[in-house]
From Swiss-Prot:
Microtubule inner protein component of sperm flagellar doublet microtubules. Microtubule inner protein (MIP) part of the dynein-decorated doublet microtubules (DMTs) in flagellum axoneme, which is required for flagellum beating. May serve to reinforce and thus stabilize the microtubule structure in the sperm flagella. Involved in the regulation of sperm motility. Pfam families: SPMIP10-like (PF14983). Expressed in sperm. The keyword Cytoplasm applies. This is Sperm-associated microtubule inner protein 10. The lineage of its organism: Eukaryota, Metazoa, Chordata, Craniata, Vertebrata. The gene is SPMIP10.
Length: 133
């Protein structure tokens, strides 16, 4: 019993003025992002927001610099540290950060247990192996 009155009105067609690059950026903005955090550590602060994100006087300039450098400046993820964990999803790549520091001797086959160890520090060796990954 559908009549002509029950149909939806015809909507005007929108012109597509966007280039392919802009449509890719819009598609990327609609993706769901789940933040990643490191394990909880006592030395990491409970909550820390970078000062340049709180500076309202030069906010537009700071956002332009962040965009030029490829740093995420979204409103939902302001904190660099949250609940004694470090945010891992919008920072520098971990391998790049490790290259900036002093060179270290990397032992790939470090034993997990040594009978000569006074404290049998398996926790330290596990942490070392985890950092190599």
């Amino acid at each position: 019993m559908a009549s002509g009155k029950d149909t939806c009105p015809i909507l005007p067609k929108l012109t597509n003025n966007c280039s392919d690059e802009n449509s890719d950026k819009l598609a990327n903005k609609c993706e769901i992002h789940l933040p990643r955090f490191s394990l909880k550590q006592g030395m990491i602060p409970r909550h820390y927001v970078m000062p340049w994100k709180q500076n309202m006087k030069f906010r537009n300039v700071n956002l332009k610099h962040a965009e030029a450098c490829g740093i995420h400046a979204g409103p939902l993820e302001d904190s660099l540290f949250l609940d004694h964990s470090e945010r891992l999803c919008h920072g520098e790549d971990r391998k790049v950060v490790l290259k900036k520091g002093p060179p270290e001797i990397k032992i790939a086959d470090m034993p997990l247990h040594s009978p000569l160890s006074r404290y049998q520090s398996t926790v330290i060796s596990h942490g070392f192996r985890r950092r190599l990954i």
